[in-house]
Amino acid sequence: MIPVVALVGRPNVGKSTLFNRLTRTRDALVADYPGLTRDRKYGRAHLSGYEFIVVDTGGIDGTEEGIETKMAEQSLAAIEEADVVLFMTDARAGLTAADLAIAQHLRSRDKITFVVANKVDGIDADSACGEFWQLGLGEVYQMAAAQGRGVTGLVEYALAPFAEAMGLVRDDDGEVVTDERNYTEEEAEAEQQRLAEQPIKLAIIGKPNVGKSTLTNRILGEERVVVYDQPGTTRDSVYIPMERDGRNYVLIDTAGVRRRARVHEVIEKFSVIKTLKAVEDSNVVLLVIDAHEGIAEQDLGLLGFVLNSGRALVLAVNKWDGLDQDVKDRVKTELDRRLGFIDFARIHFISALHGTGVGHLFESIEEAYDSATRRVSTSMLTRIMQMAQDDHQPPMVNGRRVKLKYAHVGGYNPPIVVVHGNQVSRLPDSYKRYMMNYYRRALKVVGTPIQLRFHEGDNPFEGRKEKLTLSQERRRKRMMSHIKSKKA
């Protein structure tokens, strides 16, 4: 599982500052795909070995009319669906009526909540934070998000209860060990075999009303009962086991919860958090796009999260039937222009309602999964690395050329290639993209992003005092005695 952390508080207390600090470590991945913008409200964070979804719920006024009347519906949903709430306050401004109103709402939700007094830099923090105990939510944690003070400690403390469920390992000091796998040939084969034997987890995602539920019903070959909001309805996606052409799947239905707007109309209740959690839990993502509306900003936001998560990807442009040919040509041109950065993903033009093209989706889904989990040897990865280096030499750094030594598998789904060498931390992004594309072409990878990690080659003798071996000492003694005899 991957926990969800919601940032809650009135306007201008530093929620966006903390959000940017937590999520910026993932920006480099999105930056590898020009034309893709990162969502400013939902992000994937990685800190001290913990991976989590962070949500900026936006400012809450909390006026006397009642907290719920002034809180946006999406902010309420984020609090409901979060595993941890960081309730942010302004230590400089002190306790306000809005803070008290927000605290009252949070107490009624019975959520794991941490009160954060932000902007403690340059003031007497202990004195300033004392009044926030009145919120009745327990200990007050001091932070200066702009400078990064207190951020790591709070995240580690808040997410510690989830470490075991996240599969994290602790060392003897209780610290979380960051898992960057260094597979041996045997371990890589065992991991690949495990992935090959388990069902393919397929998440069908997309913005509201693009036809996800229709596509789900078409794939399953049956009309599923529409689930309406009722007290106690699960917030999680529905997991549906299925078999197709002798292969097992688990279909993750993110469109399982609906709300009825009018008596005869059903409108999907869209939950970004539920969708993001489904992406994290999947092997392959099927992103559904409405052909009538083209590429929307919400599509790009979901696409960015899929790429950051490293999941295999297939695109389905739905409602294709009935469009005039000139409209189809215009849609294809827009797709080429706006989605050129994911040229590795297959695009299908379908009609979920009539079943046109739906059967071919699974050919691409299997192809993408097989690419994401294909076994590749260290010798092959090193050979491809050497070919890329021969075709285009790495740049010079301080008069010395960056030297790539060897490469090996670092993980699957997504495929991770770990490259070792000298001064690799100074490689420009352009050369890293060149290497990534070279590996993609050489391995004929389709439907999945490839991640490259670069590790500096450690000098095993660095920091050691020179110490001669026994044979070297004997040789040195013979040489010294020979020199002395010649002088005599």
UniProtKB/Swiss-Prot annotation:
Which Pfam families does this entry report, sorted A to Z?
Answer: KH_dom-like (PF14714), MMR_HSR1 (PF01926)
Q: Where is the EngA-type G domain?
A: 3-166, 200-373
Subunit structure, per the record?
Associates with the 50S ribosomal subunit.
Q: Which residues are recorded as binding GTP 2?
A: 206-213, 253-257, 318-321
Q: Which gene encodes it?
A: der
By its UniProt entry, which InterPro entries does this protein fall under? AAA+_ATPase, G_ENGA, GTP-bd, GTPase_Der, KH_dom-like, KH_dom-like_a/b, P-loop_NTPase, Small_GTP-bd
Return the protein name: GTPase Der
PANTHER family of this UniProt entry?
A: GTPASE DER
From what organism does this protein derive? Shewanella amazonensis (strain ATCC BAA-1098 / SB2B)
Check the record and name the PROSITE patterns matching this protein. Answer: G_ENGA (PS51712)
What domain of life?
Bacteria
According to the entry, every stretch annotated as the KH-like domain falls at 374-458
NCBIfam families with a match to the protein in the record: GTPase_EngA, small_GTP
Any one GO MF annotation of this record: ribosome binding
Name the residues that bind GTP 1. Answer: 9-16, 56-60, 118-121
Its keywords, alphabetically, are:
GTP-binding, Nucleotide-binding, Repeat, Ribosome biogenesis
Decide whether keyword Transmembrane helix is in the record.
Answer: no
Family per similarity comment: Belongs to the TRAFAC class TrmE-Era-EngA-EngB-Septin-like GTPase superfamily. EngA (Der) GTPase family.
Q: Which Gene Ontology terms describe the biological processes this protein takes part in?
A: ribosome biogenesis
Purpose of the protein: GTPase that plays an essential role in the late steps of ribosome biogenesis.
